[in-house]
UniProtKB/Swiss-Prot annotation:
Top-level taxon in the UniProt lineage: Eukaryota
Similarity annotation: Belongs to the globin family.
GO CC terms, sorted: blood microparticle; haptoglobin-hemoglobin complex; hemoglobin complex
Record protein name field: Hemoglobin subunit alpha-D
Role description: Involved in oxygen transport from the lung to the various peripheral tissues.
Keyword Ubl conjugation: no
Record's keyword terms, sorted: Heme, Iron, Metal-binding, Oxygen transport, Transport
Origin species: Chelonoidis niger
GO molecular function: haptoglobin binding; heme binding; metal ion binding; organic acid binding; oxygen binding; oxygen carrier activity; peroxidase activity
Amino acid sequence: MLTEDDKQLIQHVWETVLEHQEDFGAEALERMFTVYPSTKTYFPHFDLHHGSEQIRHHGKKVVGALGDAVRHIDDLSATLSELSNLHAYNLRVDPVNFKLLSHCFQVVLGAHLGREYTPQVQVAYDKFLAAVSAVLAEKYR
């Protein structure tokens, strides 16, 4: 459960993320494809090379969806309902992949935020991304 302090930390850090939306999203996807190559199977039509426009575009969409979640942090289920439907019913993405991408996104945050990525920020983002992953996996039940 996110505390008010967690929410404030998430929103504060998100201001930095917004300045690098496409870069952070693309880097998180590239890290996921590198570390968890099985995730590439969901993107057979993508050019998966470093810096490809398709990865950059999708990375921006991913971070945009996370931004919606940040803005509506107290109503994640309603905010992410359509995205959950898409991934569960149309794309049929294994929900474990949400956790993998969440981990990669946290690595990107840590790599780019430096000292601003404190233990408190890490815990807040870990809880937030776990909540997002859980909501995205709701339709699989």
